[in-house]
């Protein structure tokens, strides 16, 4: 979902999904370069004044996940290609308790080192999408299988390493 009118504008849709045992993903920091100026813009008013738009989206999504045992059902889209933008955005994926959908690996240029940078300290909640990367190895079934196995191993190892990293970002308790 795209929160162009503010993350709270999605509240009705999010509540409908949650009330029906479903979940949603909200774009926060995407792999699309065109979105960077909007996502990293500093909010001029409202609850998250002085923070980035992406931070406000992530914080609002996290509020829907509070009180859940285990992983929440409101997720974020955080692109694997954003690299060091993650530091400038104020968004800390390691503090997020919902699923994180991460496009951009392979086909759009993200590599394992990018996963380790962006998802440092996460706790097994990152879903890396690789469909275009794998499809590029087709139509040969053996090549598709080999690409799938190879990329799965690479991503698994990168996310394990990211999970073991300690993030330097510390948020105030009320911001978590």
Residue ranges and their predicted role:
Residues 1-79, 97:
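Conserved anion-binding
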Residues 5, 30-33, 107-109, 130-135, ...:
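Short C-terminal domain-edge/linker segments immediately following a structured domain
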Residues 7, 11-15, 55-59, 109, ...:
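Amphipathic, non-transmembrane alpha-helical secondary structure
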Residues 14-18, 62-69, 88-95, 152, ...:
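Surface-exposed amphipathic alpha-helices with a cationic face
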Residues 17, 40-44, 94, 118, ...:
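Generic alpha-helical propensity signal that fires on short helical segments
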Residues 24-27, 49-52, 101-103, 125-128, ...:
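Glycine-rich loops and low-complexity Gly/Arg-rich segments
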Residues 76, 80-129, 133-137:
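A C-terminal functional module that forms or caps the active site or interfaces directly
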Residues 114-125, 136-176:
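C-terminal helical cap(s) of enzyme catalytic domains, especially alpha/beta-barrels
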């Amino acid at each position: 979902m795209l929160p162009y009118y503010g993350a709270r504008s999605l509240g009705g849709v999010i509540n409908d999904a949650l009330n029906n045992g479903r979940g949603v993903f909200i774009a926060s920091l995407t792999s699309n370069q065109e979105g960077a100026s909007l996502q990293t813009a500093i909010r001029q008013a409202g609850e998250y004044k002085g923070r980035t738009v992406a931070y406000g989206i992530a914080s609002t999504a996290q509020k829907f996940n509070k009180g859940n045992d285990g992983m929440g059902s409101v997720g974020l889209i955080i692109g694997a290609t954003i690299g060091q933008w993650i530091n400038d955005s104020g968004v800390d994926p390691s503090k997020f308790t919902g699923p994180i959908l991460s496009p951009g690996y392979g086909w759009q240029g993200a590599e394992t080192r990018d996963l380790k940078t962006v998802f440092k300290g996460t706790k097994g909640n990152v879903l890396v999408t690789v469909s275009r990367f794998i499809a590029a190895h087709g139509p040969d079934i053996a090549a598709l299988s080999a690409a799938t196995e190879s990329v799965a191993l690479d991503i698994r190892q990168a996310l394990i390493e990211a999970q073991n990293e300690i993030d330097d970002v510390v948020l105030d308790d009320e911001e978590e």
